[in-house]
Curated annotation (Swiss-Prot):
Entry keywords, A to Z: Chloroplast, Plastid, Ribonucleoprotein, Ribosomal protein, RNA-binding, rRNA-binding
Subunit structure: Part of the 30S ribosomal subunit. Contacts protein S5. The interaction surface between S4 and S5 is involved in control of translational fidelity.
Location (main, coarse): plastid
Subcellular location: Plastid, Chloroplast
Function per UniProt: One of the primary rRNA binding proteins, it binds directly to 16S rRNA where it nucleates assembly of the body of the 30S subunit.
Keyword Plastid appears in the UniProt entry: yes
Pfam family membership, one: Ribosomal_S4
GO CC term (a single one): small ribosomal subunit
Protein name: Small ribosomal subunit protein uS4c
């Protein structure tokens, strides 16, 4: 993880740690001019590691975004932001996206009253995300909510910290995406691969 954040910069979905500027001697040796391919590859890797996706999963999302109406890059980011594991992370119910994925796969999370154990589930507007009634599930979420930094919640989500309930209000607006990334470079990377 730390090699990744040193190379690619801050990845809040992967870890809360931040790279120290100028501390990596390898990057100082490689400080020559970056090729266009390397710039596109780094943007793609940033996106992949932030959301915790395999290469195959990301390629699938790029194909879905390419077929949809609108800007492929914006649609891609919307698809990734509306994943259940990412929504849990953005609500503050988990400290990282891998932590949120573990909560989902261990069956602690309900979507609209049903147990959901698929982290890639695409949340829709008016979805209600809650925890199981079991004490262990509530304790896990309570610890995450208490320890998470109180950042401003994106306007497409609302949370009730007393009942451990989150609500998806609408599809995310592009200005609320929590990662500094040029999504067009990711789309370019894949368009040149095929």
């Amino acid at each position: 993880r730390f090699k990744k954040i040193r190379r690619l910069g801050a990845l809040p979905g992967l870890t809360s740690k931040r790279p120290r500027s100028g501390s990596d001697p390898k990057n100082q040796l490689r400080s020559g001019k970056k090729s266009q391919y390397r710039i596109r590859l780094e943007e793609k890797q940033k996106l992949r590691f932030h959301y915790g996706l395999t290469e195959r999963q990301l390629l699938k999302y790029v194909h879905i975004a390419g077929k949809a109406k609108g800007s492929t890059g914006q649609v891609l980011l919307q698809l990734l932001e509306m994943r259940l594991d990412n929504i849990l992370f953005r609500l503050g119910m988990a400290s990282t996206i891998p932590g949120a994925r573990q909560l989902v796969t261990h069956r602690h999370i309900l979507v609209n009253g049903r147990i959901m154990d698929i982290p890639s589930y695409r949340c829709k507007p008016r979805d209600i995300i809650t925890t199981k009634d079991k004490q262990r599930s509530k304790a896990l979420i309570q610890n995450y909510i208490a320890s998470s930094p109180q950042e401003e919640l994106p306007n497409h989500l609302t949370i009730d910290p007393i009942q451990y309930k989150g609500l998806v209000n609408q599809i995310i607006d592009s200005k609320w995406i929590g990662l500094k990334i040029n999504e067009l470079l990711v789309v370019e990377y894949y368009s040149r691969q095929t």
